[in-house]
Amino acid sequence: MDVLYSLSKTLKDARDKIVEGTLYSNVSDLIQQFNQMIITMNGNEFQTGGIGNLPIRNWNFDFGLLGTTLLNLDANYVETARNTIDYFVDFVDNVCMDEMVRESQRNGIAPQSDSLRKLSGIKFKRINFDATSEIIENWNLQNRRQRTGFIFHKPNIFPYSASFTLNRSQPAHDNLMGTMWLNAGSEIQVAGFDYSCAINAPANTQQFEHIVQLRRVLTTATITLLPDAERFSFPRVITSADGATTWYFNPVILRPANVEVEFLLNGQVVNTYQAKFGTIIARNFDTIRLSFQLMRPPNMTPAVAALFPNAQPFEFHATVGLTLRIESAVCESVLADANETMLANVTAVRQEYAIPIGPVFPPGMNWTDLITNYSPSREDNLQRVFTVASIRSMLVK
């Protein structure tokens, strides 16, 4: 894997810097690295593809070295270099695609394609060895079963979940109380509602709670907490739990009271925040518990009192909500996040070449299915294919 990265980095630098008019002295070190790559690759043969509709391609390396010059690089020099660069880039692209479409239930962190296995040989270590990138460093750590650490921006840690629970229900669905939520990606939105605005509740207060268990532990997380859930702030028709009918939800938004957020690890509370909104942090956690209250306003103007009558019918439905958004965090496992396109790259290649469903990944690389059952085998394979996708993105956008 590190050799593949070094190949890509050398080719990217060569493609960007070996251009007509450049002083040779400015790129002499790069050309030496480029020539070392050619010397190492010459005389070797590789084969890629042969899975799904990914075509079999044979690769043979027999290229001349780039020479020296005291002057600027001319058009002939650059054209010769460009022909070599294009062939190598095409080769790296196909090695990456060949690797991205393969999976294994055992040792999925290791190269799975014949071409990448061959590149892992000791003879290729002379190719401008460079393992300074974060993703290569983490791949090497995972390969040695040492602790990794990935920094994510808006990590897709929550499987998609959208539903509701009713704590009070009537056959006519005209006086309900309960909770509804939407968990997806890096965000939780949860709302508590009471059609009667807590008129008969103790102290005219309804208590709500929402617990979310993560599939992986997050550390040093920066989080935004807001006293609102905008996705539940407009009217909607909701299908009943048994699917037999529908009920109407017409929210009027109140501010949640006595808000408490707990971050837990293995059942133990690590961080607690009470009525603190904006930016908060959590050290390490695998569970989030949100609790909040809906309190009937003790004093209301006539206009507000008309919204919340003392008896049915309840045309407007008192609602309070919270939004919790993970802005950044560190995780030992690889995840999709807002800064990367690796999941999209891997999925696109697998779809384009009609790769058959394998023993590890869910059909279509569906992220909710993948993260819901994030097994060690999936973790290993995902880190490998994401690493390869990152390397490929250096050359192919």
From Swiss-Prot:
The UniProt annotation puts the region (Interaction with the inner capsid protein VP2) at: 62-73
Q: Which GO terms describe its molecular function?
A: host cell surface receptor binding; metal ion binding; structural molecule activity
For this record, the Gene Ontology CC terms, alphabetical, are: viral envelope; viral intermediate capsid
Q: Which SUPFAM superfamilies match?
A: A virus capsid protein alpha-helical domain, Viral protein domain
The listed locations are: Virion
User: Which chain regions cross the lipid bilayer?
Assistant: none
Quick one: which residues bind Ca(2+)?
N266, D286
Which residues bind Zn(2+) per the record?
H153
| Alphabetical keyword list | Calcium, Capsid protein, Intermediate capsid protein, Metal-binding, Ubl conjugation, Virion, Zinc
Q: Disulfide connectivity? A: none
| Superkingdom per UniProt | Viruses
Q: How is it modified after translation?
A: The N-terminus is blocked.
Which GO terms of type biological process are on file? fusion of virus membrane with host plasma membrane
Main subcellular location:
virion
Miscellaneous remark of the record: The VP6 trimer contains a zinc ion located at the center of the molecule. The zinc ion is not essential for either trimerization or transcription activity of the DLP. Zinc-depleted VP6 has an increased sensitivity to proteases.
Its quaternary structure? Homotrimer. Interacts with the inner capsid protein VP2. Interacts with the outer capsid glycoprotein VP7. Interacts with the outer capsid protein VP5*.
Q: What does this protein's UniProt record list under function?
A: Intermediate capsid protein that self assembles to form an icosahedral capsid with a T=13 symmetry, which consists of 230 trimers of VP6, with channels at each of its five-fold vertices. This capsid constitutes the middle concentric layer of the viral mature particle. The innermost VP2 capsid and the intermediate VP6 capsid remain intact following cell entry to protect the dsRNA from degradation and to prevent unfavorable antiviral responses in the host cell during all the replication cycle of the virus.
- UniProt record similarity statement: Belongs to the rotavirus VP6 family.
**Protein name according to UniProt:** Intermediate capsid protein VP6
